[in-house]
Amino acid sequence: MIGTSFIDSTLVDVTFHSSLMRYSNFANCKFQHISFVKADCLQASFHYLDVKDLSILESCLDETEFLESSLNQVDLSDSSISGIVTDLKSLKGAKVSFEQAASLAQILGVTIV
C-alpha cells in the first residue's frame, strides 16, 4: 500500500496490521474506530482528519505529518516518531513516552539542557 491516496475517504472499523503504508496520504479523511498495529507509515500525511477512536500500536511514524488532526488520547508511546511533523492543536492530549516528550519539546520551542 505504499503511496496510497486515501484523500477525502471515510474509513470505519479498519485495522492496518503489519501494513506497509509509507508515503500514504490521508488528507481530509474521516476516521472512526481505526487502528494502526505494527504499521510502517514512514513519511505518511495525516492532514485535516475528523477522528473518532484512533489507536496506534508499535508503528513507525517517522517523518510523518499530523496537521490539524487530533491525536487526543492516542497513545504513541510504543511507536517510533522520529522527525514527526505536527502542530500544537494535533499534539494536544497525545500520550507519549518520556523520551518522546523530550524530542517533541522542540515543537513547543523548549530547549532542554
Predicted regions and their residues:
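Tandem repeat scaffolds
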Residues: 1-113
